[in-house]
Curated annotation (Swiss-Prot):
The keyword Ribosomal protein applies. Keywords: Ribonucleoprotein, Ribosomal protein. GO terms for cellular component: ribonucleoprotein complex; ribosome. PANTHER family: 50S RIBOSOMAL PROTEIN L36 2, LARGE RIBOSOMAL SUBUNIT PROTEIN BL36B. The keyword Ribonucleoprotein applies. One of its GO terms (molecular function) is structural constituent of ribosome. It comes from Neisseria meningitidis serogroup C (strain 053442). GO terms for biological process: translation. This is Large ribosomal subunit protein bL36B.
Length: 41
């Protein structure tokens, strides 16, 4: 999982990527290609 300051490019990497808020942090999850997971600082 990458830790990024901006998730703008992370959500555009794959069409299945979606943004989720969990416990005050913003995550990008991708079910079909899990290597595109990311978290915002």
């Amino acid at each position: 999982m990458q830790v990024l300051s901006s998730l703008k490019t992370a959500k555009q990497r794959h069409r299945d990527c979606q943004i989720v808020r969990r416990k005050g942090k913003v995550y990008v999850i991708c079910k079909s290609n899990p290597r595109f997971k990311a978290r915002q600082r």
